């Protein structure tokens, strides 16, 4: 488990706070489109018929694909026999998808099973002597809603010439709630540091990125989620949008929404060019972003996120070229209800063993972070959100799992060419700011 005692240099403190993005009132200036956090989907809200299974060593299922599938198919059959739902269970087929970078196997069940039946299949597999661990391949997601706001000016100690810096980016310089970024910039601006942003991907054409982007990779393996033509993983991490065209599309209670361009916002918060006379300032303007796409329509699967963690930190993932720019820091401004699962934890442990610091958002639900993932995972730095006056925001998750907190609102680039947006929430601020720590 990570040593929770941190030595915070001015730059480190600045980056940590900035990742959260300050959330308070804004200046009466040109209005920015603003996004504030809403609650994430509860654990199990989104149906998934995909299972992450780890088989015990020295069993046939550990090495033989047929044995892996037979174990799952047998569990499905037992569920059908015990519930009397023979028609739906009998029609369900287990399909082997792939081996994950952490060594577990991803197996997909056909959609004839209900969510309750999938839960029972998991219970059956946990009782199988050949199975070491099994859980549902949950979907995690960024959560934002749009809103207009106005507020008050800030008085920075050092004012870069980025035109929106002084009016909107209080989280960088406000003496009470800010991160004192100007003092940190005097010491370091992140040169030579690679930050992997595991998110919705990137829109690379914005002028304020100023060449701070590596190519990255798209790890989404479901065409319905990625909005690409196939399930194949591809280089580039291009954000195809995560809009939801109607209510209840992703789960009961989900609402229609436009694309968040969340990954572009987070990447800009970290590394958009500073003092270049364009837009806003980045907390670590000389760092380099490695965009890794794991979130799309309705979110992203845990299995894809786990593989992305392995790859971003320099580990090996079958079918994906080696990462020639392993990240010093991984940022995950994403999450969902439920405690940390074993697949995510194993992936994080591997990343830390390779020398990568993993920073995650605590969550925007106003709840104990222990009940959210990856906020509750060990070997991470979990970051909550504070207000302009330094107190915790109304929406920030809290509790013993939260290691650090920083301004919960930040302006950055958005999905429109040359555009900017203000987002409130630790998700867009916490991780980017922590990278500078």
Question: Across the structure, where does each feature detected by a protein language model lie?
Answer:
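Gram-negative bacterial Sec-dependent N-terminal signal peptides
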Residues: 2-26
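Primarily auto-inhibitory N-terminal propeptides
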Residues: 15, 26-166, 185
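Catalytic-core regions built around general acid/base machinery
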Residues: 340-358
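Protease zymogen maturation seam
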Residues: 31, 99-102, 126-194, 202, ...
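Loop/turn elements at helix/coil->beta-strand transitions in domains of secreted/extracellular proteins
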Residues: 129-133, 191-195, 286-290, 325-330, ...
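Subtilisin-like peptidase catalytic core
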Residues: 182, 193, 200-201, 212-343, ...
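Extracellular S/T/G-rich loop segment that most often corresponds to the catalytic His/Ser-adjacent loop
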Residues: 222, 233, 356, 372-437
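Active-site glycine-centered loops adjacent to acidic/histidine catalytic or metal-binding residues
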Residues: 199, 363
């Amino acid at each position: 488990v990570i040593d929770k005692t941190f030595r915070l240099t001015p730059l480190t403190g600045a980056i940590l706070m900035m990742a959260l993005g300050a959330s308070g009132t804004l200046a009466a200036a040109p209005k920015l489109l603003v996004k504030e956090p809403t609650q994430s989907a509860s654990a199990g809200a989104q149906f998934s018929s995909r299972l992450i299974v780890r088989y015990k060593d020295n069993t046939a299922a550990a090495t033989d694909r047929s044995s892996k599938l037979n174990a799952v198919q047998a569990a499905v059959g037992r569920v059908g026999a015990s519930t009397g739902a023979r028609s739906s269970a009998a029609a369900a087929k287990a399909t082997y998808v792939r081996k994950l970078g952490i060594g577990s196997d991803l197996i997909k069940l056909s959609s004839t099973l209900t969510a309750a039946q999938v839960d029972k299949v998991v219970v059956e597999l946990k009782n199988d002597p050949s199975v070491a661990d099994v859980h549902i391949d949950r979907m995690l997601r960024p959560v934002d809603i749009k809103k207009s706001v106005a507020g008050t000016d800030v008085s920075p100690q050092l004012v870069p010439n980025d035109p929106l810096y002084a009016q909107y980016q209080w989280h960088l310089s406000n003496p009470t709630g800010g991160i004192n970024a100007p003092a940190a910039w005097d010491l370091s601006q992140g040169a030579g540091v690679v930050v992997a942003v595991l998110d919705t991907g990137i829109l690379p054409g914005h002028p304020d990125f100023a060449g701070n982007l590596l190519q990255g990779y798209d790890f989404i393996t479901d065409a319905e989620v990625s909005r690409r033509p196939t399930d194949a993983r591809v280089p580039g991490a291009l954000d195809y949008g995560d809009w939801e065209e109607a209510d209840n599309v992703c789960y009961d209670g989900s609402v229609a929404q436009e694309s968040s361009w969340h990954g572009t916002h987070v990447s800009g918060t970290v590394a958009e060019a500073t003092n270049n006379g364009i837009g806003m300032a980045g907390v670590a303007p000389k760092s380099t972003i490695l965009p890794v796409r794991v979130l799309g329509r309705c979110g992203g699967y845990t299995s894809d996120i786990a593989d992305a963690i392995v790859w971003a930190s320099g580990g090996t993932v079958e079918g994906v070229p080696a990462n020639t720019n392993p990240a010093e820091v991984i940022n995950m401004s994403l999450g969902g209800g439920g405690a940390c699962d074993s697949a995510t934890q194993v992936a994080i442990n591997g990343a830390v063993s390779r020398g990568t610091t993993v920073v995650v958002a605590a969550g925007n639900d106003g709840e104990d972070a222990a009940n959210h993932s990856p906020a509750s995972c060990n070997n991470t730095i979990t970051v909550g959100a504070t207000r302009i006056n330094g107190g915790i925001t109304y929406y920030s998750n809290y509790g013993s799992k939260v290691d650090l907190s920083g301004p919960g609102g930040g302006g950055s680039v958005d999905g429109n060419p040359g555009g900017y947006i203000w987002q409130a929430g630790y998700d867009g601020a916490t991780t980017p700011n922590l990278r500078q720590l």
